[in-house]
């Protein structure tokens, strides 16, 4: 199976290319924090030679509680994204939840993301595809890796073949997620070689019974990320925060920003090693 390359400016995203770090914060909390977080990622990735795309949401439309912080909204969020691009020269990925958001968001950012909970909503998928933007499809927690091929087909039928697939964990009973490491190769096969990336942060989520917000397993972020990159994938999705315990969304799963360089250094070493190996055919 030939690995497809999705280009984001001068960045090649492919399962056999050096991994791309899609990193940032869960949701835009303020303009100043976005600048701080983006600058930290840029410094680390430039130092280590890791391709980088900034990530954040302008609206977390699927929060469990109506009282939870959602973000600054599309208009203000796009202004912040544009300033990040102008200041740091970064590529940006963000998610959309409504059809009317697709084109305005695609006009500013470089990748638009199809949220896991909405990945089978055909009208939204079609609207995203018709923008011509690169699309990152989050695998729903309730969907098997092999079913991702159907979502890819919807996008391709609209004339867009710039597709990245992302695993963010699978439901394991109630209120818990696990990651099936065999699922990455299944998604590669289902999409006929599209890039597959791993959202390690959201895969660490778990819930307290009757709670209004997700808990998380931040202490295990390194071992889970190592495992994912050891499979041989196109990229890693990561959220970091200056003070995870004070984050407005998913702080229990976020990497402390102070640990970013050490973390990325380890991930690069693993990715370099794994992709230095010749591919073995064990299917005989």
Curated annotation (Swiss-Prot):
Record-linked Pfam families: DAHP_synth_1
Alphabetical GO biological process terms: keto-3-deoxy-D-manno-octulosonic acid biosynthetic process
GO molecular function: 3-deoxy-8-phosphooctulonate synthase activity
Residues forming coiled coils: none
This protein's UniProt keywords: Cytoplasm, Lipopolysaccharide biosynthesis, Transferase
GO cellular component, one term: cytoplasm
Keyword check for Transferase: yes
Swiss-Prot/TrEMBL catalytic activity: D-arabinose 5-phosphate + phosphoenolpyruvate + H2O = 3-deoxy-alpha-D-manno-2-octulosonate-8-phosphate + phosphate
InterPro entries cross-referenced by the UniProt entry: Aldolase_TIM, DAHP1/KDSA, KDO8P_synthase
Enzyme class: transferase
This protein's pathway: Carbohydrate biosynthesis; 3-deoxy-D-manno-octulosonate biosynthesis; 3-deoxy-D-manno-octulosonate from D-ribulose 5-phosphate: step 2/3; Bacterial outer membrane biogenesis; lipopolysaccharide biosynthesis
Record-listed E.C. numbers: 2.5.1.55
Subcellular location(s) per record: Cytoplasm
Keyword check for Ion transport: no
Predominant place of localization: cytoplasm
Family designation: Belongs to the KdsA family.
Name by which UniProt lists this protein: 2-dehydro-3-deoxyphosphooctonate aldolase
Source organism of the structure: Haemophilus influenzae (strain PittGG)
Gene from which this protein is expressed: kdsA
